[in-house]
Amino acid sequence: MTMAGGRRGLVAPQNTFLENIVRRSNDTNFVLGNAQIVDWPIVYSNDGFCKLSGYHRAEVMQKSSTCSFMYGELTDKDTIEKVRQTFENYEMNSFEILMYKKNRTPVWFFVKIAPIRNEQDKVVLFLCTFSDITAFKQPIEDDSCKGWGKFARLTRALTSSRGVLQQLAPSVQKGENVHKHSRLAEVLQLGSDILPQYKQEAPKTPPHIILHYCVFKTTWDWIILILTFYTAILVPYNVSFKTRQNNVAWLVVDSIVDVIFLVDIVLNFHTTFVGPAGEVISDPKLIRMNYLKTWFVIDLLSCLPYDVINAFENVDEVSAFMGDPGKIGFADQIPPPLEGRESQGISSLFSSLKVVRLLRLGRVARKLDHYIEYGAAVLVLLVCVFGLAAHWMACIWYSIGDYEIFDEDTKTIRNNSWLYQLAMDIGTPYQFNGSGSGKWEGGPSKNSVYISSLYFTMTSLTSVGFGNIAPSTDIEKIFAVAIMMIGSLLYATIFGNVTTIFQQMYANTNRYHEMLNSVRDFLKLYQVPKGLSERVMDYIVSTWSMSRGIDTEKVLQICPKDMRADICVHLNRKVFKEHPAFRLASDGCLRALAMEFQTVHCAPGDLIYHAGESVDSLCFVVSGSLEVIQDDEVVAILGKGDVFGDVFWKEATLAQSCANVRALTYCDLHVIKRDALQKVLEFYTAFSHSFSRNLILTYNLRKRIVFRKISDVKREEEERMKRKNEAPLILPPDHPVRRLFQRFRQQKEARLAAERGGRDLDDLDVEKGNVLTEHASANHSLVKASVVTVRESPATPVSFQAASTSGVPDHAKLQAPGSECLGPKGGGGDCAKRKSWARFKDACGKSEDWNKVSKAESMETLPERTKASGEATLKKTDSCDSGITKSDLRLDNVGEARSPQDRSPILAEVKHSFYPIPEQTLQATVLEVRHELKEDIKALNAKMTNIEKQLSEILRILTSRRSSQSPQELFEISRPQSPESERDIFGAS
């Protein structure tokens, strides 16, 4: 018996787009492309297109749906542009275009393009169909086509009228755009229906098809069950008791029952049924063929109007009999037996054919699983079966007594018949009417006879038997024996072993319902959301319908190893036969692989792989369809025969999935783990080479596809146009950003000037107002080149006095920013003491700047001069923290305005190397800065303490003043005061 889910079928919402396209397209060659990704990559191609183009499915995946990879030198450029425009505008169109197969053979194709929409009416896919029309086009003239002259003339004659092409596209001319959805099916030659949408939806049925599990059909089945029992009761009764249909009311009732059963036949032609795989079959053609092959003939024979035909045959006899008012009515008296035997003929034949109506019980048999779904109905049905058996036995028991009570030879009544004994017991003996009809009359009434017959059969079936009605003749005794045998069997089976029957017949069903109850309790206990709960329940029902509650692993464990391997090979035969990678595998290798395979059943919406999850299995799709989603876009649709996962045999590391793999329909996957596959490949070395060479993954989850969405491209284009149309941003001259960039530009110019000054060192001269370097005796001093930053803001001139070091007393230095302490005045004396932190910044700045200059080879040694004269007109910036010294002159202009006589002779051969600041100096500076920061922090803490004390004192004074003042004074104090008044108040306090 099947459980409720199996009877109902698999009715969860699923995306059957791929199955519908494949079913409707028949032998059409087509590909599906994603309409939301740039270049519209191919996400699915059927076997027909692969065979037509010569490419494997894995080779065309992710290539453009325009099939640009099949273009060649003879492909028309205008047609290529029209194809691209059709994709860009999401239009339906058809083209004749020349393309090239994988072996570069030119082929003429009739290409038809149609957009596929989802539930939001958004184009998500493109369906492109290809028809080979090379035979109807002029052969392509090249070196490989010599000798085709006759064929060329023939094809030119065929294509002159273009009649064949019109048959290929009866309603769509070349280049014609079709905008009406109703013509989509006609364009693509997929039938009269509109192309399905790419969305998840519940199984739909045509308007004239009835679901077998709907409320109406369930109610109708119960009505048919009741009428079937009505037929099973009345047909044997009417045949045994030879009841004529002289009662118009009963004739009308029987006719209505016949009409209802005829209507049931019509409904069966429009009622869905459950297929062998658990799917709901709603195709009208399949429904009709299935019913015609199974129960149609039996149902038709059981519905013929035998009562109506019999009534017309006996109309004269019934009228004559009803016209005699002295006769006993047939409702109360048994019809004369002799008269019934004398009037045999067509009427008796049709009366006997009423038994054919018992074939209606077949309806109960084939729909028994509908009724036993309810526990109380099972017990009622069993009791009804027992009572129906007793009723049939009672009718047969009366027929035996009616046949033996009259002796045909002597025209007398047999005294040993049970009917004669019953007539004598109840006081209604039989009497012979010699003066009238000359027939036997009287006897027990029909009701008494039926009740007595049923009483006898029930006592016999239950093995009770009181003996007040007992068989006397041989036939009666034989029948009594048969009744007792049947009764013992029925009694023991139905009543004695009801519990055993339920356990044996419904063990799987009980286990199924127990599992469902456990799952329901679990979902209710943990308050699982409704959507997820429905998915869980649907998955359990679908899995049970596929496995029928059989634990495959448990069964395989019972079998020995050799038998278990044979069973596994049989279970995975589809994978081994469909994929060429297993063709060269030996029997032992196949058996080893089959032992490692696992069968996985997936419900619609299940995620087989999540993005970022480890890919540790190789999956073969046996049935159903799946979609691969990367960045919320469908990048591939996988169907029967596809393989996805990772190339474990080529990669040493475990891969992470770059996309989600989600089931669109109910799917059956054959999965093998990574470690198990590698173990088999390591053992069977010869097979491993063939396997790695021939197995082509339809989609490799390790690789991430790089694409750009059309929506992103359009958005970027809109932003670019928006920026282009916007007015440029204008910053005022005194804007901080503009000043910052101006400072960077000036510093760059100063560095370039320093470099040029180093290169022109031989001609260097010092202009008026700059510091001069003199040459004294034989001692030479290194003069530092300064990088001077010039700002637009006016600077305060600061006089500078060159300080002589102990080592070089007669030399002056051109001071760099921050290199020396500058006094506020130009006179002699010591420089004011500067902060250690400023000196540390100056030292670091000098170290970095001088190193850069040294690396750029822009620092040149300056020769010694004989005299030191003049002063450098240096300026200090008005910045309070930078301390950068500025000059009105630039180093690249040094020496240009000086006269030759003012210049000192340059000793080119005397060079002084530059040495950066020693590390000990930096360390000392850092320690000094650290000590100074500690002192500053202590000073700040002391100031904060003083401020807190002052605030506390102020609060205390305010509190005391408030407590000592009147409300009027408080009101006056609360008024706003000027800053001067506030200072006066606080000062006074």
Swiss-Prot record:
Residues 14-94 form the PAS domain. InterPro entries: cNMP-bd_dom (IPR000595), cNMP-bd_dom_sf (IPR018490), Ion_trans_dom (IPR005821), K_chnl_volt-dep_EAG (IPR003949), K_chnl_volt-dep_EAG/ELK/ERG (IPR003938), KCNH_animal-type (IPR050818), PAC (IPR001610), PAS (IPR000014). PROSITE patterns: CNMP_BINDING_3, PAC, PAS. It is a multi-pass membrane protein. One of its GO terms (molecular function) is calmodulin binding. The modification Phosphoserine is found at S974, S978, S981. Glycans are attached at N415, N433. Changing V737S: Abolishes inhibition of channel activity by elevated cytoplasmic Ca(2+). CDD domains: CAP_ED, PAS. It catalyses: K(+)(in) = K(+)(out). GO terms for cellular component: axon; dendrite; early endosome membrane; intracellular membrane-bounded organelle; nuclear inner membrane; perikaryon; plasma membrane; postsynaptic density membrane. Residues 151-162 are annotated as: Required for phosphatidylinositol bisphosphate binding. Pore-forming (alpha) subunit of a voltage-gated delayed rectifier potassium channel that mediates outward-rectifying potassium currents which, on depolarization, reaches a steady-state level and do not inactivate. The activation kinetics depend on the prepulse potential and external divalent cation concentration. With negative prepulses, the current activation is delayed and slowed down several fold, whereas more positive prepulses speed up activation. The time course of activation is biphasic with a fast and a slowly activating current component. Belongs to the potassium channel family. H (Eag) (TC 1.A.1.20) subfamily. Kv10.1/KCNH1 sub-subfamily. The segment S4 is probably the voltage-sensor and is characterized by a series of positively charged amino acids at every third position. Conformational changes of voltage-sensor are driven by an electric field generated by a potassium gradient across the membrane. This is Voltage-gated delayed rectifier potassium channel KCNH1. The gene is KCNH1.
